[in-house]
From Swiss-Prot:
Region (Disordered): 1-28
InterPro entries reported in the protein's UniProt record: Ribosomal_uS11, Ribosomal_uS11_bac-type, Ribosomal_uS11_CS, Ribosomal_uS11_sf
Family: Belongs to the universal ribosomal protein uS11 family.
Entry GO CC: ribonucleoprotein complex; ribosome
Listed transmembrane segments: none
Lineage, broadest ranks: Bacteria, Bacillati, Actinomycetota, Actinomycetes, Acidothermales
The protein, known as: Small ribosomal subunit protein uS11
Amino acid composition bias (Polar residues), ranges on this chain: 1-10
Protein purpose: Located on the platform of the 30S subunit, it bridges several disparate RNA helices of the 16S rRNA. Forms part of the Shine-Dalgarno cleft in the 70S ribosome.
UniProt key word Ribonucleoprotein: yes
Superkingdom, taxonomy of origin: Bacteria
Subunit composition and interactions: Part of the 30S ribosomal subunit. Interacts with proteins S7 and S18. Binds to IF-3.
A GO molecular-function annotation: rRNA binding
GO biological process, one term: translation
Organism of origin: Acidothermus cellulolyticus (strain ATCC 43068 / DSM 8971 / 11B)
Length: 135
């Protein structure tokens, strides 16, 4: 049996990111009790840039802090600005602590915030909530 030779078929192909020229878009901020995720999309909903607290470098309980939300929103906004984003409409979802901080940091980076909407899903008395924690 001849020795096996290695081939490059398993190598990863790195695709270059193309610059999208989008001036106006949507910023979706999902702020949970454990994490904050910011996705910036074009008006049709295609994601241009995103960031999460874990991706920015926070681990464990530090992901749920307002500072982590601030850094997450800044990272996503900078990536979106590379694609020409200047103005966003903000959609906030979830009960987390980083909601307002993320919006403020979007403005601080230089994105103009057009409107802010709360799109947190509210049940019409659907599932029973989890029991209260006793610590």
């Amino acid at each position: 049996m001849p020795p096996k030779t290695r081939s490059q078929t398993g190598a990863k192909k790195v695709r270059r990111k193309e610059k999208k020229n989008v001036a106006h878009g949507h910023a979706h901020i999902k702020s949970t009790f454990n994490n904050t995720i910011v996705s910036i999309t074009d008006p049709s909903g295609a994601v241009i840039a995103w960031a999460s607290a874990g991706q920015v470098g926070f681990k464990g309980s530090r992901k749920s802090t307002p500072f982590a939300a601030q850094m997450t929103a800044e990272a996503a906004a900078r990536r979106a600005q590379e694609h020409g984003m200047r103005k966003v409409d903000v959609f906030v979802k979830g009960p987390g602590s980083g909601r307002e901080t993320a919006i403020r940091s979007l403005q601080a980076v230089g994105l103009e915030v057009g409107s802010i909407q709360d799109v947190t899903p509210v049940p019409h008395n659907g599932c029973r909530p989890p029991k209260r924690r006793r610590v």
